[in-house]
């Protein structure tokens, strides 16, 4: 009879412990319900990138001296620099400059070590295409400045600094973002 009583006591203690664990996990879940949403509606809302963001590379053809430093510091020898030696002036003349963004790892070494600052990183990150050969940008495509996300009136920009206000009087299933 005595082992049966201790068995019931152990069962009761285990039941109380399980109920406490369930209650703790439920309280954690409820504490997360008060947080603001983290996700954004991507095509219509875009986060503003930071200053140090490494996006598509912008190239200025007139500043380049064809020194090929960018090729030497690139971990995968990616930039293709075609030049010829102009015998009259004894200088290199740049003919073609291209980067394949399908292979580029966006490390930023080429931008950092360029002596003439003809390379710079932009905030453009939407480089997806259906054909991988379209990711090979020549000096004309690299020279185009991307449209800034801030200047595009069709896109609502959001930052991590401004909190999004959520209507409190609506039920949880139909929360809407208010300005």
Swiss-Prot record:
Chemical reaction(s) catalysed: a plastoquinone + NADH + (n+1) H(+)(in) = a plastoquinol + NAD(+) + n H(+)(out); a plastoquinone + NADPH + (n+1) H(+)(in) = a plastoquinol + NADP(+) + n H(+)(out)
Classification via Pfam families: Fer4_10
UniProt remark on cofactor binding: Binds 2 [4Fe-4S] clusters per subunit.
Gene3D superfamilies: 3.30.70.3270
4Fe-4S ferredoxin-type domain residues: 55-84, 95-124
Binding site for [4Fe-4S] cluster 2: 74, 104, 107, 110
Cofactor(s) for this UniProt protein: [4Fe-4S] cluster
Cellular localisation: Plastid, Chloroplast thylakoid membrane
PROSITE patterns: 4FE4S_FER_1, 4FE4S_FER_2
Gene Ontology molecular function: any one: quinone binding
GO cellular component terms attached to this protein's record: chloroplast thylakoid membrane
Keywords assigned: 4Fe-4S, Chloroplast, Iron, Iron-sulfur, Membrane, Metal-binding, NAD, NADP, Plastid, Plastoquinone, Quinone, Repeat, Thylakoid, Translocase
UniProt topology in membrane: Peripheral membrane protein
EC assignment: 7.1.1.-
InterPro entries per UniProt: 4Fe4S_Fe-S-bd, 4Fe4S_Fe_S_CS, NADH_quinone_OxRdtase_chainI, NDHI
Biological processes annotated in GO: photosynthesis, light reaction
Keyword Chloroplast: yes
Oligomeric form and interacting partners: NDH is composed of at least 16 different subunits, 5 of which are encoded in the nucleus.
Job of this protein: NDH shuttles electrons from NAD(P)H:plastoquinone, via FMN and iron-sulfur (Fe-S) centers, to quinones in the photosynthetic chain and possibly in a chloroplast respiratory chain. The immediate electron acceptor for the enzyme in this species is believed to be plastoquinone. Couples the redox reaction to proton translocation, and thus conserves the redox energy in a proton gradient.
Family indicated by similarity: Belongs to the complex I 23 kDa subunit family.
UniProt-recorded name of the protein: NAD(P)H-quinone oxidoreductase subunit I, chloroplastic
Gene source species: Acorus calamus (Sweet flag)
Gene (name only): ndhI
């Amino acid at each position: 009879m005595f082992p049966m009583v201790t068995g019931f006591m152990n069962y009761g203690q285990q039941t109380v412990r399980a109920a406490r664990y369930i209650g703790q996990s439920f309280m954690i879940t409820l504490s997360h319900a008060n947080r603001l949403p983290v996700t954004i509606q991507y095509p219509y809302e875009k986060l503003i990138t930071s200053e140090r963001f490494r996006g598509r590379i912008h190239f200025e053809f007139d500043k380049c001296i064809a020194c090929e430093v960018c090729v030497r510091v690139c971990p995968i020898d990616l930039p293709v620099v075609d030049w010829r030696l102009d015998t009259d002036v004894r200088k290199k003349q740049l003919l073609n400059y291209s980067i394949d963004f399908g292979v580029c790892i966006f490390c930023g070494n080429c931008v950092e070590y360029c002596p003439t600052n003809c390379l710079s990183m932009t905030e453009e990150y939407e480089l997806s295409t259906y054909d991988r050969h379209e990711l090979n940008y020549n000096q004309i495509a690299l020279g185009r400045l991307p449209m800034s996300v801030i200047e595009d009136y069709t896109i609502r920009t959001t930052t991590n600094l401004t909190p999004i206000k959520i209507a409190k009087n609506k039920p949880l299933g139909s929360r809407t973002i208010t300005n």
